[in-house]
Amino acid sequence: MESATHISIMPKIDGYDIVSIGEEAFANCTSLQSVTIPASVTEIGSAAFYGCTALTKVTVPDAVTKIEQGTFFSCTALTDLTLGKDTTEIGDMAFGYCTSLETVTLPDTVETLGDQLFYYCTALDEVQIPEKVTELGGYTFYGCMSLKSFTVPKNLENIGAMSFVACPSLETIAVEDGNTKYQAVDNVLYDTEESILYLYPAGRTDTSFTLPESTLVVYAGAFFAAGNLQQINFDEKLQYIGEMAFDFCSGLTSLTIPKAVTTIGTTAFADCTGLTSVTFSGASDEDGGEGGDLEIGDYAFFCDDNLKEVQLPKRVSSVGKYAFGCTSPADDDDSEDYVTVSSDSGDNLKVKALDGFLLIGYTGAASDYVKDCDVKISFKAMNVNWKAVMLWGILAVVLVAVLLIAIRLIRRNMMTAEEKKALQEAEAEHKIPLSQRGKQDEAAEEKPEYDDGYRSILDDDDEDEAEEVADYEQTISHSQLHHIGHADMPAAEDEKKDKEDEKDEK
């Protein structure tokens, strides 16, 4: 069956009516170009024609009231689709990746539309939502590159998150009269109070936009890929910036986050490659400013490759993973200076530190982000806990003192008796005034032995005797002079004695 190009399903087999086409019945029949479904069929299973990439035309019988999940998913050649007039429900991704589908007519009987209904229908440029539909699922028109306009029906009460993300051609948004939930002001979609901005069409040519004073919330994906936008002005009352709100706004060059903002969602400003300046109002206020705690989501400023410095306010209570100073290496980047992480979609993502980036903030959430990040990010602290620094300093001094005392005691216990005696003498010497230390040494000297001058009568060496007598006389004279205060010392002897005394004092 995989090679069949045209299939006509018989209405009966062996006398039994064909009422159902099972799940994945024709899945991945890549040669199938057309199929004829009999009127007796009331049910078509999920993914029944999944991956029929050559299928160009399908007519669904009126008796089929529900199109199941993924029924025509990835029928990339499908251009002509007719649904039964009694259809009431269409499941998730029923027409996802039907990249050739340009127009779809949904019967007025339809009441329920699933999530991602027209996911990446890149050729779809026009579709009307039936009046009975009250809710649009999330990501309904995600990736509809050719969609130029959309009208919100009067009974629509809820537009799912990211419903118009990646619709770069969308220029016009309108709301039918009688809708009590939404309004369009200058082709921008708000709630009736203008407190929530739901959608700024990405195809607008404006280079700047100012939010109304009444706007408190920027909805998820509201400005996604608004490539012409270079400047966004937030009112000081703004409180919430949703997930992917400004993702891929590559023209943005600078922005200021008001003090009142308490949440910046995941990837809110990711891939803003032109962004060079981000200012958080009150970032330099050490008291935290007037706003409440600020939570910054994962990847909030990821891949903002020209953003080199950000100063965070003290009121930041949490910073998500890879929110600042991180990027994804280019495909031709041969360096291994990156980490591989699992993204929310389950895919592996390479992350590396952004060269030259500096995060400035306070100890707490900001410093914890840098400490816990898998890649190395430069950080400058705005505050220092001086009490903690002083306490640690005192403890360090005490520890050093205790350590020195312990070392001294250990060394004393290891000394020999001679070393201990020498140490005691040195300590005693240290207690004597400097002016008295030399005199104490002189007093302690042993007096020379007295020689009565008698010589052996057998010694007849005159020269030796003369030398001995000279020594004797000098010894007597020197000894006597010590006792009488140098009274009778000749001049030469005085000079010699002075030199010796100076030497002793030294």
For every predicted segment, state its role:
Residues 382-396:
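Juxtamembrane/start-of-transmembrane alpha-helix segments at the extracytoplasmic/lumenal side
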Residues 22-25, 45-50, 68-73, 91-96, ...:
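Consensus positions within tandem repeat domains that build extended binding/scaffold surfaces
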Residues 498-506:
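Short acidic DE-rich linear segments
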Residues 414-482, 486-489:
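Cytoplasmic C-terminal tails of single-pass
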Residues 365-375:
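Short, aromatic/basic amphipathic alpha-helical patches
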Residues 3-19, 30-43, 53-66, 76-89, ...:
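Structural signature of tandem-repeat unit edges
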Residues 400-409:
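Alpha-helical transmembrane segments
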